[in-house]
């Protein structure tokens, strides 16, 4: 739909009747004459539909109705004046004269007077660009009941724009179902009318969301088929099983603050909480016996010895010493290892790869531990000191001694049961 240029941008909508005219037609203006000279006439718009204007905001144009006594008031240039806002006049908007011989006004005189009488137009069309606006000139008896001197619009209750062709390219507000032809006007409408611009609304509770993802996540709370997992020891409810399992660990751990009865997954988190939230009752002395020398809690203990670990994976790797399990095997020589790091370092003996280089000389090494030993031995005067406490070192030595004794007992037991295998 083509845009109409106006003097006042506030008048956004004009109603038109689209008339298809071919170039070979003899006349593009439909004129009918009547001999009803003295009856006042008015204007009425027929077959209206919405017209899109440059700024895209739709408003109804108010048109001034006038009472004209005769058709002498119709000039060749001035046709209709619209409430002082703009006028259809001049060469931009003018009546197209009829050039057809069949449509020329008759020059014969009135039988009663013998002279040619001025006749009011019964219908005329105004062409704007390639569009034709058609107006109907009616008599006072055919005019609406409203007084002609009022400033009301001629068009009462115009039909809304609902055709897909008319709605193409418009911006639709999801809150109030209003259409806009300009993006800036649409965004300003969202901010001024609907507040914080949350177009997505939950049909269950009325909550609004800024994006569809948030609304979809919210709709899960209304689902009747949503699984619920409740804790067996407290009234808390969880929507996921893993959340419930993680919560259960807090009931079985000893990491509980006795001041506020809060649960913590680790002993370190509990001590940090006590030092910050309850500094008056916090004991900053040596850690209890169930803590490792590095300050971490000893949550896992070996099934074969009394050695304790903070992480479960460290305990599993340690137990391979007792079981003799070596799950990692080399693809070159089929040699097996208990740890993946040992296998990686062994494979480099086959590939001759030396990824770790010394920054002070040109020597390179297979792993980082060899590089560290080289730096301490060749480039520093300090002796190699292992970062481990004396008490922890003695504990490890005792555990290794017990492991050797247990292994010797197992070998003797096997020898007694199978004496011929030795």
UniProtKB/Swiss-Prot annotation:
One of its GO terms (biological process) is regulation of transcription by RNA polymerase II. GO terms for cellular component: nucleus. Residues 95-119 are annotated as: Disordered. Its main location: nucleus. It comes from the Eukaryota. Residues 99-113 have a biased composition (Low complexity). It comes from Caenorhabditis elegans. Disruption phenotype: No visible phenotype. Double knockout with lin-35 results in sterility, defects in gonad migration and vulval morphology. One of its GO terms (molecular function) is zinc ion binding. Expressed in vulval cells and all somatic gonad structures such as spermatheca, sheath cells, uterine cells and distal tip cells. It is found in: Nucleus. Disulfide bonds: none annotated. Probable zinc finger transcription factor that acts as a transcriptional repressor. Acts redundantly with the transcriptional repressor lin-35 to control the development of somatic gonad lineages. May, in addition, suppress sensitivity to RNAi. A zinc finger (C2H2-type) spans 171-194, 200-222, 229-251, 255-278, 300-322, 328-350, 356-379. This is Zinc finger protein zfp-2. Pfam families: zf-C2H2. Keywords: DNA-binding, Metal-binding, Nucleus, Repeat, Transcription, Transcription regulation, Zinc, Zinc-finger.
């Amino acid at each position: 739909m083509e845009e109409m240029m106006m003097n006042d941008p506030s008048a956004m909508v004009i109603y038109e009747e689209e008339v298809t005219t071919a170039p070979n037609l003899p006349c593009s203006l439909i004129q009918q004459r009547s001999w009803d000279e003295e009856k006042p006439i008015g204007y009425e718009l027929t077959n209206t539909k919405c017209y899109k204007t440059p700024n895209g905001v739709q408003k109804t144009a108010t048109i001034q109705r006038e009472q004209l006594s005769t058709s002498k008031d119709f000039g060749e240039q001035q046709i209709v004046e619209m409430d002082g806002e703009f006028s259809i006049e001049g060469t931009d908007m003018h009546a197209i004269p009829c050039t057809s011989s069949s449509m020329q006004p008759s020059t014969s005189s009135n039988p009663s007077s013998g002279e040619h009488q001025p006749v009011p137009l019964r219908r005329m069309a105004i062409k704007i660009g390639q569009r034709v606006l058609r107006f109907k000139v009616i008599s006072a008896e055919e005019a609406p009941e409203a007084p002609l001197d009022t400033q009301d619009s001629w068009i009462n209750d115009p039909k809304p724009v609902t055709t897909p062709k008319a709605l193409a390219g418009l911006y639709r507000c999801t809150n109030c179902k209003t259409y806009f032809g300009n993006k800036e006007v649409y965004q300003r409408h969202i901010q001024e009318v609907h507040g914080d611009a949350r177009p997505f609304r939950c049909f269950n509770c009325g909550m609004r969301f800024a994006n569809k993802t948030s609304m979809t996540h919210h709709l899960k709370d209304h689902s009747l088929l949503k699984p619920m997992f409740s804790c067996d020891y407290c009234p808390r409810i969880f929507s996921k099983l893993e959340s419930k399992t993680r919560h259960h660990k807090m009931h079985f751990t000893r990491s509980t603050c006795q001041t506020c009865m809060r649960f913590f997954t680790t002993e370190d988190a509990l001590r940090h909480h006590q030092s910050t939230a309850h500094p008056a009752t916090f004991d900053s002395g040596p850690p209890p016996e169930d803590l490792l020398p590095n300050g971490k809690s000893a949550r896992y203990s070996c099934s074969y010895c009394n050695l304790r670990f903070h992480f479960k994976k460290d305990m599993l790797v340690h137990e391979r010493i007792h079981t003799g399990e070596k799950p990692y095997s080399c693809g070159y020589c089929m040699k097996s290892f208990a740890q993946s790091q040992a296998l990686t370092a062994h494979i480099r003996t086959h590939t001759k790869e030396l990824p770790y280089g010394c920054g002070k000389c040109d020597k390179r090494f297979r792993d980082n531990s060899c590089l560290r030993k080289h730096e301490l031995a060749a480039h520093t005067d300090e002796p190699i000191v292992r970062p481990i406490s004396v008490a922890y070192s003695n504990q490890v030595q005792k555990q290794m001694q017990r492991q050797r004794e247990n292994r010797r007992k197992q070998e003797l037991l096997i020898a007694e049961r199978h004496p011929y295998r030795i």
